[in-house]
From Swiss-Prot:
Protein name: Glucose-1-phosphate adenylyltransferase
GO MF terms held by the record: ATP binding; glucose-1-phosphate adenylyltransferase activity; structural constituent of carboxysome shell
Keyword ATP-binding: yes
Any one GO cellular component localisation term in the record: carboxysome
Reaction catalysis annotation: alpha-D-glucose 1-phosphate + ATP + H(+) = ADP-alpha-D-glucose + diphosphate
Top-level EC class: transferase
Keywords linked to the UniProt accession: ATP-binding, Carbohydrate metabolism, Glycogen biosynthesis, Glycogen metabolism, Nucleotide-binding, Nucleotidyltransferase, Transferase
Activity regulation, short description: Activated by 3-phosphoglycerate and inhibited by phosphate.
Residues that bind alpha-D-glucose 1-phosphate: 162, 177-178, 209
Record-listed E.C. numbers: 2.7.7.27
GO biological process terms, semicolon-separated: glycogen biosynthetic process
Known partners and oligomeric status: Homotetramer.
Pathway assigned in UniProt: Glycan biosynthesis; glycogen biosynthesis
Length: 429
């Protein structure tokens, strides 16, 4: 894999994940209590022996830069690196990234200098575990110009993805990005060609692109240079290339989830607590997911009742009830709290005992969840200060609401408390 360069697309403004992307780039959003989204594709690369990795980003990249700099330091005796390339304006190109392909095009001058055979294009907001070596091996065996990683998909979600038709050799003969109505119906295929059983094929009659591509180096350079108006891989580059290039499909038959929306992000995190077998597990010694070593003390639970939950390191929980939830590092839950079906991202720092007591004496709210608070079906972002006897339960069953001045949003019925928000004593949401 020394001849492969990975390019992870950091995504746009992250509007579908807002407000989690208010102060951070999408790949820097915390996941599963201690990781960040960027750790997923980077770990997949490392486990696949791909060590040349660029991350392209445009918005709020400070925390992403910090995380990558602290986490992925390869030794000086290898060519390996993980580097963030932020959007920049130049005399030749005064514009920001206009799309996924344009992001790669603007850094082509740097990427084409590498002595590699393939570019591996990845997305920064997917949850999955994949050995890219098998993917690239298939690309080489079929002598493909481009290979797309694909999954079979059902009617309900089909219009959210790029869909394709393939022939018996696996070659892509038609491609349509997020079709609707009649255009969607035209993309139905017999997915038994992918090896599905007739029953599976009946329920999943579409072949969807995962947004993961391998390009021959010279093919990508040619496609990006010859038509500057093509700014997006899914909408323009791939459909046009399918007409006159050997574009192959590679079936990925394991768990994969696009967690680019609040609802999908929430569901994917809580699914990690499922018993006995969650759809995705971080407990895999063969292909671990890496992140920053924080050197935190073990979690302390004092008279707590915890069921079906994941609790990050360095947490302090006192006489509380935690059910079907994920708690991030340094979470602090006080006496009498009840946390149900919620994702708490934890905190970036500890408040010293003296400082906490001073805050309480002054009438301020310390970082963490105050006594006798109930949180149900919510996401609590980092460093939130939630007071005494607060109820975050979406009492009116609101589906969508923007209450930034009050420290929270509601998305798909899920209450999202902002990073650094203060929710005062007795508040009912």
């Amino acid at each position: 894999m020394k001849k492969v360069l990975a390019i992870i697309l950091g995504g746009g403004a992250g509007t579908r994940l807002y407000p989690l992307t208010k102060l951070r780039a999408k790949p820097a959003v915390p996941v599963a209590g201690k990781y960040r989204l960027i750790d997923i594709p980077v770990s997949n690369c490392i486990n696949s022996e791909i060590f040349k990795i660029y991350v392209l980003t445009q918005f709020n990249s400070a925390s992403l830069n910090r995380h990558i700099a602290r986490t992925y330091n390869f030794s000086g005796f290898s060519e390996g690196f993980v580097e963030v390339l932020a959007a920049q304006q130049t005399p030749e190109n005064p514009n920001w990234f206009q799309g996924t392909a344009d992001a790669v095009r603007q850094y082509l001058w740097m990427l084409q200098e590498w002595d590699v055979d393939e570019f591996l294009i990845l997305s920064g907001d997917h949850l999955y575990r994949m050995d890219y070596r098998l993917f690239i091996q298939r690309h080489r065996e079929t002598n493909a110009d481009i290979t797309l990683s694909v999954i079979p998909i059902d009617d309900r979600r089909a219009s959210d993805f790029g869909l394709m038709k393939i022939d018996n050799s696996g070659r892509v003969i038609d491609f349509s990005e997020k079709p609707k109505g009649e255009a969607l119906t035209k993309m139905r295929v017999d997915t038994t060609v992918l090896g599905l059983t007739p029953e599976q094929a009946a329920s999943q009659p579409y072949i969807a692109s995962m947004g993961i591509y391998v390009f021959k180096k010279d093919v990508l350079i040619k496609l990006l240079k010859e038509a500057l108006e093509r700014t997006d891989f899914g909408k323009e580059i791939i459909p046009d290339a399918a007409k006159d290039h050997n574009v192959q499909a590679y079936l990925f038959d394991d768990y994969w989830e696009d967690i680019g929306t609040i609802e999908a992000f929430y569901n994917a995190n809580l699914a990690l607590t499922q018993q006995p077998m969650p759809p995705f597990s971080f407990y895999d010694e063969e292909a671990p997911i890496y992140t920053r070593a924080r050197y935190l003390p073990p979690t302390k639970l004092l008279d707590c009742h915890v069921t079906e939950s994941i609790i990050g390191e360095g947490c302090i929980l006192k006489n509380c009830r935690i059910q079907h939830s994920v708690l991030g590092v340094r979470s602090r839950i006080e006496t009498g709290c009840m946390i149900e079906e919620s994702l708490l991202m934890g905190a970036d720092f500890y408040q010293a005992s003296v400082e906490r007591q001073c805050s309480i004496d002054k009438g301020d709210i310390p970082v963490g969840i105050g006594p006798d608070t109930i949180i149900r079906r919510a996401i609590i972002d980092k460093n939130a200060r939630i007071g005494h006897d607060v109820k975050i339960i979406n009492k009116d069953n609101v589906q969508e609401a923007d209450r930034e001045s009050q420290g929270f949003y509601i998305r798909s019925g899920i209450v999202v408390v902002l990073k650094n928000a203060v929710i005062t004593d007795g508040t009912i949401i």
